[in-house]
Amino acid sequence: MSNERDTSRTPTPDHAEHNAFFPSPYSLSQYTSAKTDFDGADYPTPYNGGKKVLMIGTDERYILMQNGSMFSTGNHPVEMLLPMYHLDKAGFEFDVATLSGNPVKLEMWAMPGEDEAVKSIYAKYLPKLKAPQKLADLLEQAVADDSPYAAVFVPGGHGVLAGIPHSREVKRLLNAFLAKDRYIITLCHGPACLLAPAVEEKPEDYPFKGYEICVFPDALDTGANLEIGYMPGPLPWLVGENLQKLGVKILNKGITGQVHRDRKLLTGDSPLASNNLGKLAAKTLLEAFAR
């Protein structure tokens, strides 16, 4: 019994990469399910004004951990697709971009196979996820005064840690959205994107200093996620710790599905917040643009 328990908590090898691992069977039994908490998306007067939402996905699956192993990750499908479902039903179409223009990488082991809402929005946007735009190629349009985008959405999943927080393109985009009073939507590990405006800047000039957010707790990444074999080793760096160093205030200590709006920044704490954040984002954008 003890040996079976230990084995089920051992990360599963991913043979597509040297020394790479998926989450353990036990961790997936705790963290994933066939259905989400989706309970409807009722937007009787959807937006029809033409503004869209730009979703920035991760184009990298592997994170090099402190012990030399590779974590096989990507974007979490629920964190991406449930907010997309709500916003799409509210009338906001999505464009999809990655840093390289290569396909968005999803944690398919977390896909809720019996959730019709998630499956339907995945099918609708699969062509864009497989062939996204390169962020640099649409950046000038995205930051322009007549930008077609009402908001930018950065879903979570540990894959966000690879590239997006260090991207000069993401830095310019977020700075422009702040300056032009547009919306930024992100959850779980997605708020790692908020580190981009600090690239090559003095900490005292950080534009999100004093903002309150929800984000996946560092304590889980340094504790339970290692203990149950969700990750094969310690992360190279921690999202919350680095945001707090820059003056961001983290509201949540656990993962309960908490969401929060601070000015034009909408955040959620974990996959459990996906449905709530989708509702908050849809309601917020409809109030702002459906006039």
From Swiss-Prot:
* Region (Disordered), start-end ranges: 1-24
Q: Where is the composition biased (Basic and acidic residues)?
A: 1-18
Q: Which InterPro entries match?
A: Class_I_gatase-like, DJ-1/PfpI, HchA, Prot/Nucl_acid_deglycase
| The keyword Repressor is assigned to this record | no
Any one Gene Ontology BP term: methylglyoxal catabolic process to D-lactate via S-lactoyl-glutathione
* GO cellular component terms listed in the entry, alphabetical order: cytoplasm
GO function terms (MF aspect)? glyoxalase III activity; protein deglycase activity; thiolester hydrolase activity
Where is it located?
Cytoplasm
Report the EC code(s) recorded for this entry: 3.1.2.-, 3.5.1.-, 3.5.1.124
Report the Pfam families cross-referenced here.
Answer: DJ-1_PfpI
The UniProt keywords, alphabetically, are: Cytoplasm, DNA damage, DNA repair, Hydrolase, Stress response
Q: Which reaction does it catalyse?
A: N(omega)-(1-hydroxy-2-oxopropyl)-L-arginyl-[protein] + H2O = lactate + L-arginyl-[protein] + H(+); N(6)-(1-hydroxy-2-oxopropyl)-L-lysyl-[protein] + H2O = lactate + L-lysyl-[protein] + H(+); S-(1-hydroxy-2-oxopropyl)-L-cysteinyl-[protein] + H2O = lactate + L-cysteinyl-[protein] + H(+); N(omega)-(1-hydroxy-2-oxoethyl)-L-arginyl-[protein] + H2O = L-arginyl-[protein] + glycolate + H(+)
| Keyword Hydrolase annotated | yes
On the tree of life, the source organism's domain of life is: Bacteria
Q: Which residues participate directly in catalysis?
A: C188 (nucleophile)
Free-text function comment from the UniProt entry: Protein and nucleotide deglycase that catalyzes the deglycation of the Maillard adducts formed between amino groups of proteins or nucleotides and reactive carbonyl groups of glyoxals. Thus, functions as a protein deglycase that repairs methylglyoxal- and glyoxal-glycated proteins, and releases repaired proteins and lactate or glycolate, respectively. Deglycates cysteine, arginine and lysine residues in proteins, and thus reactivates these proteins by reversing glycation by glyoxals.
| Family, as annotated | Belongs to the peptidase C56 family. HchA subfamily.
Write down what this protein is called: Protein/nucleic acid deglycase HchA
